[in-house]
A protein has these predicted regions:
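RNA-contacting regions in translation and RNA-metabolism proteins
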Residues: 1-313
Length: 313
């Protein structure tokens, strides 16, 4: 009799749990794509289980932001990725790393997005580090970037706070890939952009000093821009600028070399050592000229004598 009662009790508990899960599924099946708020309830390996009030949801390891730490009883907001009703019964899957989490935060924070005056055209995210979001306005009088930033940056600050200080770049959308790349790679100044429509590659040329800005830390800026516009963005330094600079140096060095009777190679070495004019050559010690040009010191003295002769003439 006791075993039968125990079995009946276990069966009843299982049915109750199943009924609760079915209620969960019915309540949440249409809420995929929303943001919900809950309390961290427990951990199972790297998965986080979150109490949503009546029900428990799970944020799997793959949906976590790797730079975030969670503790029991922490209140967190998350995006409902899916409501599944398979194998183990109904389950609510949450995410804080999904790009649509950022999308929904903007929709709740920016009234112009909520009323569809401003549209989010594209979004690319490396959760915990950086997000790029491209926005467009139906109304010419409404600045889409300004609307998202808010007065004194209030709107975007609220979003960044929710994302634990993840960088958020808000970009003006353009149907022209060139214009969009130029916006997305700011603050780097673009020297030239060429498009390979067949391979969907954007070749971007920047100056030496802008190269690291355009590529970003560990290539992040260029990588996110590629995802944002759905083209492969390849950034390279402007070699022609360097070539023009080298040509000017070589030309000036050649002129100096002709005056002093030096080969182009020695003249270039002298020029790079600081001997840009005859007057500056005369200020250089003979031993310094000798070591810079890799010549014996008597030859360095001959160069100085020639420079002295030319300036005195």
């Amino acid at each position: 009799g006791r075993i039968a009662v125990q079995t009946a009790k276990q069966t009843m508990q299982q049915r109750l749990r199943m009924a609760e899960k079915e209620m969960l599924f019915e309540e949440f099946k249409d809420r995929a794509g929303e943001i919900v708020s809950g309390v961290v309830h427990r951990f199972e390996r790297s998965d986080v289980y979150i109490d949503l009030g009546k029900f428990e949801a799970v944020m799997p390891s793959r949906e976590r932001v790797q730079t975030e730490e969670y503790n029991i009883n922490d209140r967190i907001r998350a995006y409902v990725v899916a409501v599944e009703n398979e194998g183990r019964g109904p389950e609510v899957i949450l995410s804080r790393s999904h790009p649509h989490f950022v999308r929904r935060l903007f929709e709740s924070e920016v009234s112009e997005i909520a009323d569809h005056t401003v549209e989010i055209r594209a979004i690319a995210r490396e959760a915990g580090h950086r997000t790029k979001i491209a926005v467009w306005s139906k109304d010419d009088k409404v600045d889409p970037v300004g609307a998202c930033v808010g007065l004194r940056g209030a709107r975007v600050k609220n979003i960044v706070r929710e994302l634990n200080n993840e960088k958020v770049d808000i970009i003006r959308w353009s149907d022209d890939p060139k214009a969009l790349v130029e916006e997305a790679l700011k603050p780097a100044t673009i020297r030239s952009i060429t498009l390979d429509h067949e391979k969907k590659i954007v070749h971007v040329t920047v100056s030496e000093e802008d190269l690291s800005k355009a590529i970003g830390r560990r290539g992040q800026n260029a990588r996110l821009t590629s995802r944002l516009i759905d083209w492969d963005v390849q950034v390279r330094r402007d070699e022609s600028q360097q070539q023009r600079f080298n040509d000017r140096i070589n030309s000036a060095a050649h002129g100096l070399g002709e005056q002093l009777g030096l080969s182009d190679e020695l003249a270039a070495k002298l020029f790079r050592a600081g001997g840009i004019t005859l007057e500056l050559v005369l200020e250089m010690p003979a031993d310094y000229i000798a070591s810079s040009l890799e010549i014996p010191e008597p030859e360095a003295n001959e160069i100085l004598a020639k420079a002295q002769q030319l300036t005195s003439a």
